[in-house]
């Protein structure tokens, strides 16, 4: 059974904090919500390997499930690489590449961003400097071959990260601890160039319109049929910063992989994003696909023997 960890707990609150109404049931903790979602994943997307981490940036309350488990990072890691480039190069140099990275997840532009930093080894030095010990760039061969000599290769030839590392990074980005004010603001704006919903925008699909519009995120996907071994890949990651109605924000990483049914895995990620928002926004009326969840998620995809998988790439 997965272990659910409460990293930081609640920061000290002022003595004038609003008290719950007399007789009202105690509010469910973020830890309990995350634990419930982990249980749902086994029912809604059997076979999916899930890691999830979330931090309420208003209070510091943070919970995770399998938060240190390594996952293939796919394109979600590109936010690390652009941040590293902004720490070394001026905005004018980074901007043309970063806009492609976030607008269309351009892989060749991402390789050029890695080159701006000094190559894969330099990216890993940057990550270690931030204390992200469970994240590494191993190779990036778009445009040309790039191999790291200092990757621990925890996942063989694949690039990887973990949910806890990503949420830690996003929280520090939001607190303006990683970069100077101007590049920080620009990186956050670039994170709004990504899809708002649907393929590549799973984090926003079931959020209210206002939250979807202001969403700052980066999806990463390696869908069935893309990479030669669906049992290893079928990667669907979403990482980002979400704004709540009171102006507060939270950082979230939902990492799902290896699920044999892509639509079921995608539905779970969309629903998990919505359920977390509903809890943190205290919006009990928000529909996170309840009827579909009660039905077990989307109908299973059944393929004839030898038939190719549907094209689930974001084109």
Model-identified regions with their sequence ranges:
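Positively charged n-region of N-terminal signal peptides that target proteins for export
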Residues: 1-4
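Hydrophobic helical h-region of N-terminal Sec-dependent signal peptides
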Residues: 6-10
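C-terminal motif of bacterial Sec signal peptides marking the signal peptidase cleavage site
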Residues: 13-15
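Bacterial signal peptide processing site
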Residues: 17-19
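Penicillin-recognizing serine hydrolase domain
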Residues: 25-50, 55-59, 114-315
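Active-site SXXK
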Residues: 60, 70-92, 101, 252
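A short glycine/serine-rich beta->alpha loop
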Residues: 64-71, 152-155
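Short, well-structured active-site flanking segments
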Residues: 87-100, 105, 120-123, 180-183
